[in-house]
Amino acid sequence: MARALMFQGTGSDVGKSLLVAGLARAFTLRGLKVRPFKPQNMSNNAAVTADGGEIGRAQALQARAARVPLSVHMNPVLLKPQGETGAQVVVQGRVHGTAKAAAYQGMKPSLLPFVLDSFDRLKAEADLVLVEGAGSASEVNLRTGDIANMGFARAADVPVVVIGDIDRGGVIASLVGTKAVIDAADAALIKGFVVNRFRGDPSLFATGMELIARQTGWAALGLVPHFSEAIRLPAEDALALSAPPAPKPRARTRICVPILPHVSNFDDLDPLDAEPSVEVRRIRPHETLPVDTDLVLLIGSKATIADLAALKAEGLHHDILAFARRGGHVMGLCGGYQMLGETIADPDGIEGEAKIARGLGLLKVHTVLSPEKRLVEVAGVALDPAVAAPFSGYEMHMGVTAGADAEQPFAVLSDGRQDGARSASGRVSGTYVHGLFASDAFRSGLLGALGGAPSQAAYEQGVEETLDRLAAHLAAHLDLDLLFSLAR
């Protein structure tokens, strides 16, 4: 029977996802069959499974670290915020409906059986299941009906390790405070704590570790130094967008990406960020398009019509249209592709009130949103002669796009379908495929077409090497044998 160990945090973004990914690789390298599991995740950064479901992108990275295929059971409840209608609720990989916050609280007890079913399925095929909590373990106001943290741990009888982030300050208060506010039955499941992202001389925090252990009664399981290479791994959620990569003054290619309120699948940017000669600039509200832009890239959105309205409200559409008139290159991915067209119709009110929105008009295509969601892994070849390279990726969208420019498609897919559209000039293009920038040949061809340096990077190989180094980093600062002994 498989063992399981759960990692909860004192708050969001304390490093739970990365720690689970690193431990998944470390225990896998020891010969164990490892499966990652997160009962409930909230993110618009999702990955497609082979059977046409979807899970959080963090669990996809953890599965990769464990060297196993993605499964919808690794993240049985995925919440995808989508504007005025609340959040789309995805259960075991399939859309279950939409709910606003208050309604979802009432829905949670009915979702626990799905969560436990998925957990049991993973345990049946693994030696060790590494469970990640969500947000903070100490949100006692949300404890009733909880399925993400202690509610799940109690229901599944899984021991817990609590993670605190010293980099943001107040880690002693965060950990001791967590013990103070949770009830005794929940606290009984906690076996120890880890202090994450430490910088400096570890001996200077020895008394801090002792104080936390004394105040909580939990075992001090490790002080993990900051892992600077984390930026080489795909980001989990939109918090990463608040800390964009450092400027690259010597970059040969500058790609500008408007950051809109309901941005999704922003991990499409990671392979571009990893290019030494490419600077990906995030364009925030009230900012204008820089004059040295080589490509405007509109990425995915969970509320396309609302984000299109936000783009226009900021006046950034004027910059984009002027840039295109001057011969600039513009590319749209999924929701960004839909925005580039002439109209987006939502007759069924998928994104709220039924309406028709006028797009940017840079592509002669029209989109009709529909309730059916397309989730599929794809491969294909870009048809732009300047790029003409193979790629792989995935589709994740609700809607159909057609029109004159779709007769000059962006790509032909391996199943024979045509995807996307290109303008008559070839300088404006759109595609429904996410993840294509991770394909080295395609990325290199695109950068060359923009007049930049063709890529010499091997992105996927770099992710694998970084996971190996993360595993070694954790193995050097955590007792893996002790952690395994705590699992049950």
Curated annotation (Swiss-Prot):
Keyword Amino-acid biosynthesis included in the entry's annotation: no
A GO biological-process term: cobalamin biosynthetic process
Source superkingdom: Bacteria
Keywords linked to the UniProt accession: Cobalamin biosynthesis, Glutamine amidotransferase
Gene Ontology MF annotations: ABC-type vitamin B12 transporter activity; catalytic activity
Classification via Pfam families: CbiA, GATase_3
UniProt domain GATase cobBQ-type: residue ranges: 252-442
Active site: 334 (nucleophile), 434
Pathway the protein acts in: Cofactor biosynthesis; adenosylcobalamin biosynthesis
Family: Belongs to the CobB/CobQ family. CobQ subfamily.
Function comment: Catalyzes amidations at positions B, D, E, and G on adenosylcobyrinic A,C-diamide. NH(2) groups are provided by glutamine, and one molecule of ATP is hydrogenolyzed for each amidation.
Name this polypeptide is given: Cobyric acid synthase
Gene for this chain: cobQ
